[in-house]
Amino acid sequence: NLAVVAVFFEQGKANPALANLLENVPERDQNVAIRAPFDANALIPSDKDYYRFNGSLTTPPCSEGVRWLVIKDPQSISAEQIAQFEHVMGENNRPVQPLNARMVLTK
C-alpha cells in the first residue's frame, strides 16, 4: 500500500517554494541530485483540508492500493514555472478515471 499527498496548482504568481526545485530540474532522461534541501512542507497550505479516496497510481502499471490525500486549497504557480515542468516532463497525466462507486471523503 502507498499513500500520496497531492497538491493542485493554478496559474498565477510564481511559487517561491518551487523556485529552488526548478533550478535543479534535469533535462529529460537525465538524473541529478538536488543540491539544496527541499522543504516539501512549504507546498502545503496553512488550510490543510483535503479530499481522501482509494485509487491507483497515475503512471504504469497504474496499480491499485493507493490512498490519495488531495489538498483542497490550490497553490499558485507562474506560467514560466509551468513551462519549466512541461519542458522536462512533457504530457504525463493519466486521463481521469471513472469513480466506480469509490467514496471520496472530505476533511
Regions found by a protein language model. Name each.
Residues 1-107:
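Extracellular or lumenal secretory-pathway regions
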